[in-house]
């Protein structure tokens, strides 16, 4: 009887395995029947599009298409764009530069704004602007949810529009739209390069979600909900893999600093010194260094200066709480001769930013420090220079800021920085206790600020060292480094064009 039961069980198992195998085989066959033709169609479509748009590339010239949809924004990213173009114009006057932009200003208005904002005089003979009408697809406001993937897919729509209007020899993305890379590489046949200010996604972002930590890109509604946390973690990991794939299409990657470089190396699997290079962004070091040092002659006031847009990640609350702690622990800062003041300088983009400023004003009242706090919104360059010439301490509180142009400007102007002990300021800009200070907590910030203001004579040398250390962030240094790494691509393009011309002849 036992043998019969065993035989029935074995036969049942065999039948079950055969049934499962046949089902799987049928499923695989169905997938093959459906997927293989689809893959063939996609490949055929790519080849057809490559023939159509690749043939539009003018082989009689070398052109560089700069993908920068917001070229008139007037920030650090735009200084990178215009300095890069200026460098190309001076070194390769015969190379055609094209800027893909969604801005509606006329050419003259853009040229004039670049001159007024950055004091950069661009040549007009070999620079043109191609207007893009689909910029709304990369605006964060278009995607209240799934912003990362939404903007990334949206950039492909914008990139397609750009490709259909002009196919460059070299495509250079300078705003972080990596999903445009395969479009220009596979279909346009362009050599892809990029300048990365910060990775679209990083291991820090994933770790923040994994640990359920609250941050500006991981709000309480997600960090406090396990299901949402797991869902977002899956979303981030999938996006990270796709980001790695599109990043592989770039033959040259320039990054603004060590922190960004390390993350891009890990995500895109690039190699420092081979296809990944650090090129510090250009900062108006020359202009800031013209300001008088005036450390001991009374020119510098007991002013703490903050330069940062009023965005949540800039963490202005920490600055106010630092001042409150300073005034509480060292009451002498409330009175003459110290009478220490915090001046917050920054721009506002929208109503949310304006509301944030109002919240900060209310916080200063709650902390009983409103008489020692001043807000300067959207001030002129001359007004900023005046503040830079009067301030003694600069405060920077953003965690993991990819670089920190504001910190460099402070140092060049003769303002001793107390910056956040993370990312760009820590790895590339401030040498702790040599050219400034690095802090993480309210207590650390307050102690360093007190030390600088109360014992001013000890920091004469630090002020000079801080200013001298900013030479590596000058426009001329950026130009030299940028040309060093873009030259091989331009020279290779010239050789390819010459070879194609000979074949046609």
Swiss-Prot record:
Catalytic reaction equation(s): an alpha-D-Man-(1->3)-[alpha-D-Man-(1->6)]-beta-D-Man-(1->4)-beta-D-GlcNAc-(1->4)-alpha-D-GlcNAc-diphospho-di-trans,poly-cis-dolichol + 2 GDP-alpha-D-mannose = an alpha-D-Man-(1->2)-alpha-D-Man-(1->2)-alpha-D-Man-(1->3)-[alpha-D-Man-(1->6)]-beta-D-Man-(1->4)-beta-D-GlcNAc-(1->4)-alpha-D-GlcNAc-diphospho-di-trans,poly-cis-dolichol + 2 GDP + 2 H(+)
Principal localisation: endoplasmic reticulum
S-S bridge residues: none
MF-aspect GO terms: alpha-1,2-mannosyltransferase activity; GDP-Man:Man3GlcNAc2-PP-Dol alpha-1,2-mannosyltransferase activity
Annotated function: GDP-Man:Man(3)GlcNAc(2)-PP-Dol alpha-1,2-mannosyltransferase that operates in the biosynthetic pathway of dolichol-linked oligosaccharides, the glycan precursors employed in protein asparagine (N)-glycosylation. The assembly of dolichol-linked oligosaccharides begins on the cytosolic side of the endoplasmic reticulum membrane and finishes in its lumen. The sequential addition of sugars to dolichol pyrophosphate produces dolichol-linked oligosaccharides containing fourteen sugars, including two GlcNAcs, nine mannoses and three glucoses.
Matching PANTHER family: GDP-MAN:MAN(3)GLCNAC(2)-PP-DOL ALPHA-1,2-MANNOSYLTRANSFERASE
Protein name: GDP-Man:Man(3)GlcNAc(2)-PP-Dol alpha-1,2-mannosyltransferase
Protein species of origin: Dictyostelium discoideum (Social amoeba)
